[in-house]
């Protein structure tokens, strides 16, 4: 690393290549030169923030710093990098790249296809950017990047493997007026709510339907709609679902909780 670089150093950025933890029994023959302290070791709570490189994820990180993470906590920024597709802000699949037209193969001016190494470097850089609010707030944290074709299952597997106390994830449009016909959350957040072993906090990114930001409050934003769900043996019951409207401005930490 260039010591004169302005880019912030973030500890323990990992990219795990096995498609599943079940196939990770083969260890590298290389031996680490020295054991380094884990930033999350000894924390009172280990909070995971699942990110997908979107503005919704950036909002969820900022919300977690302002309203959820407390002194004594440590944070794991968790990203599942898809093996064949990119996942957009709504946690839905988008093609990683479309096949070039036949003429592109012989066009000397055609852009070269990015390599897997390019994509890995881009992913690490974007996730590091998302973690900046944690560094600025002084919360101990690490970045954990894994690869899998099934984002939903892998998020739940990593949540259990990392022994997280709670997982926070961002989402756009999961409010009552935007839910599916069955009233469920989005596919990934809904899966995590019902399969993660710890509570899942889904932070809805506010949009124009939520109205303007509060007047006269410099730096204020519209309120975030937050759904908190805990997994229980009877987790199909509606009475587990609690919605909260929480002001996203850092200066206001009053929470208004209501049961559905």
Swiss-Prot record:
Listed Low complexity bias regions: 29-41
Residue positions binding ATP: 18, 80, 170-179, 187-189
Assigned keywords, A-Z: ATP-binding, Chloroplast, Nucleotide-binding, Phosphoprotein, Plastid, Transit peptide
Record's subcellular location: Plastid, Chloroplast
GO cellular component, one term: chloroplast
Record's comment on post-translational modification: Phosphorylated by MAPK3 and MAPK6 after pathogenic elicitation (e.g. bacterial flg22, Phytophthora infestans zoospores and xylanase).
Cross-referenced Pfam families: Usp
GO MF, one example: ATP binding
Compositionally biased spans, kind Basic residues: 14-28
Top-level lineage group: Eukaryota
Modification Phosphoserine occurs at: 20, 230
Entry-linked InterPro entries: PHOS32/34, Rossmann-like_a/b/a_fold, Universal_stress_UspA, UspA
UniProt transit peptide range: 1-33
Stretches for region Disordered: 1-42, 92-118, 209-260
Gene Ontology biological process terms from the UniProt entry: response to molecule of fungal origin
Ranges of biased composition (kind: Basic and acidic residues): 251-260
Disulfide links within the chain: none
Keyword Lipid metabolism (UniProt): no
UniProt family annotation: Belongs to the universal stress protein A family.
Additional free-text comment from the UniProt record: Can bind nickel.
Name of this protein: Universal stress protein PHOS34
Protein's organism: Arabidopsis thaliana (Mouse-ear cress)
Gene: PHOS34
């Amino acid at each position: 690393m260039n010591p004169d670089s302005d880019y912030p150093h973030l500890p323990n950025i990992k990219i795990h290549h096995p498609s599943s933890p079940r196939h990770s029994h083969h260890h590298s023959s290389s031996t680490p030169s020295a054991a380094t302290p884990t930033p999350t070791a000894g924390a009172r709570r280990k909070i995971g923030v699942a990110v997908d490189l979107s503005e919704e994820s950036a909002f969820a990180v900022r919300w977690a710093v302002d309203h959820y993470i407390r002194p004594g906590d440590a944070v794991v920024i968790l990203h599942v990098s898809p093996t064949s597709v990119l996942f957009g802000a709504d946690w839905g699949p988008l093609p990683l790249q479309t096949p070039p037209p036949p003429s592109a193969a012989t066009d000397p001016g055609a852009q070269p296809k990015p390599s897997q190494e390019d994509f890995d470097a881009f992913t690490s850089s974007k996730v590091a950017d998302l973690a900046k609010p944690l560094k600025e707030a002084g919360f101990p944290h690490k970045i954990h990047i894994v690869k899998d074709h099934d984002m939903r299952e892998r998020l739940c597997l990593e949540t259990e493997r990392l022994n997280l106390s709670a997982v926070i994830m961002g989402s756009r449009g999961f409010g009552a007026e935007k839910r599916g016909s069955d009233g469920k959350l989005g596919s990934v957040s809904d899966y995590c709510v019902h399969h993660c072993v710890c509570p899942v906090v889904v932070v809805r990114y506010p949009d124009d339907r939520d109205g303007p930001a509060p007047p006269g409050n410099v730096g204020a934003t519209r309120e975030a709609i937050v759904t908190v769900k805990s997994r229980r043996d009877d987790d199909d019951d509606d009475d587990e679902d609690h919605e909260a409207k929480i002001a996203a401005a850092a200066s206001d930490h009053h929470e208004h909780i209501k049961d559905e």
